[in-house]
Amino acid sequence: MSLTRLLIRDFRNIETADLALSPGFNFLVGANGSGKTSVLEAIYTLGHGRAFRSLQIGRVIRHEQEAFVLHGRLQGEERETAIGLTKDKQGDSKVRIDGTDGHKVAELAHLMPMQLITPEGFTLLNGGPKYRRAFLDWGCFHNEPGFFTAWSNLKRLLKQRNAALRQVTRYEQLRPWDKELIPLAEQISTWRAEYSAGIAADMDDTCKQFLPEFSLTFSFQRGWEKETEYAEVLERNFERDRQLTYTAHGPHKADLRIRADGAPVEDTLSRGQLKLLMCALRLAQGEFLTRESGRRCLYLIDDFASELDDERRGLLASRLKATQSQVFVSAISAEHVIDMSDENSKMFTVEKGKITD
């Protein structure tokens, strides 16, 4: 599925824009601060309900306006789908699909699987475990129909359990929460483990092409001890959890550990190599989705040329083209992306929030 049309109104520094898009490569060229990243962010927000540069809604809505409006048309193999998202300064959202209101942001996310590559995306590799959990959970969300509901219920139960830890004195008082929590935790952990095992070959193959000089390993850590039942872990750690006033073990502590030549990648790789690894992982994830479901990702790449030399840019471009996916690329200069362009591409110029093609 590709985004054939995008309407942006009062988003960041963009007053209004109506863009007819290519199903292949779309290039956004302009100086820093021109608004090219805002276009990428608008697409991301349309598919996620939130921006990737700021969680503060007031910074995303254009100055002195009350709300932003985003509309898109998605073209699939058999049908076209109209989608829309409006969000006001109070953070209230309205999702519209094919002319009807009352839909959830998760429905947009399912319709628009996308991969985001930005200069800030190094957190996937050198940030905390939550970023790598998000990587795994993206895959589980798009591969397991029941994942989102289970994950939402898990978050709710953990919040309730942590609140109860401030009041209870005996483990038996926690059993009502744990009775619901344990099967959810085990199911989510199983899905994550299966996903990490399934995508392992894709990650390995892509990383060997991007970083052949390193031996990279990936290991899923579920968040509690191996070969130990989660019920046993919760009961055994009750006193410690009560002192901490939060649940110290579980799927909310899971991680995907990534090592290069046996050492953490953040201690071994340069910034350019970290970007290559990040790109390799995002590509592997998108390609795995296509192979498993027949659905293609939409790729958003901000500041394409940063951290990469000509050879590595060429490698990334060729791999992106091979996916046959829709790709959006921002760059300061057209020279950085001209080699990627073909007769099906579209080149947009962005200046002070105005977009022309």
From Swiss-Prot:
It holds the Pfam family SMC_N. One of its GO terms (biological process) is DNA replication. It is found in: Cytoplasm. One of its GO terms (molecular function) is single-stranded DNA binding. GO terms for cellular component: cytoplasm. Its main location: cytoplasm. ATP binds at residues 30-37. Keywords: ATP-binding, Cytoplasm, DNA damage, DNA repair, DNA replication, DNA-binding, Nucleotide-binding, SOS response. The RecF protein is involved in DNA metabolism; it is required for DNA replication and normal SOS inducibility. RecF binds preferentially to single-stranded, linear DNA. It also seems to bind ATP. NCBIfam families: recf. Belongs to the RecF family. This is DNA replication and repair protein RecF. It comes from Shigella flexneri. The lineage of its organism: Bacteria, Pseudomonadati, Pseudomonadota, Gammaproteobacteria, Enterobacterales. The gene is recF.
